[in-house]
Curated annotation (Swiss-Prot):
Organism of this sequence: Desulfitobacterium hafniense (strain Y51)
Entry keyword set: Chaperone, Cytoplasm
Protein encoded by which gene: groES
GO cellular component, one term: cytoplasm
Family: Belongs to the GroES chaperonin family.
Protein name, UniProt field: Co-chaperonin GroES
Length: 94
């Protein structure tokens, strides 16, 4: 991947949503909620604070849960990604 986020930003690839509910109902695209779970594919160097770089807590390969309306959606090489600040990440899964 050639995207390198700046500062405390993280690039995430959203994980696909379930096509069916637990009861077996197939969800149309219009009824699906915006994804909130993804995999970290790139991490910035961290933000500068008082002349020191604060390293991010997440790393490439982490599965994370993030705020529903956080970040900026971008398309690169035919793939869709989300670029957001580390503070928009709510939890690391696993």
């Amino acid at each position: 991947m050639n995207i390198k986020p700046l500062g405390d930003r993280v690039v995430i690839k959203a994980l696909p949503m379930e096509e069916k509910t637990k009861s077996g109902i197939i969800m149309p695209d219009t009824a699906k909620e915006k994804p909130q779970e993804g995999e970290v594919v790139a991490v910035g160097p961290g933000k500068m604070e008082k002349g020191e770089r604060i390293v991010l807590d997440v790393k490439v390969g982490d599965r994370v849960i993030y705020s529903k309306y956080a970040g900026t959606e971008v398309k690169y090489d035919g793939q869709e990604y989300l670029i957001l600040k580390e503070t928009d990440i709510l939890a690391v899964i696993g």
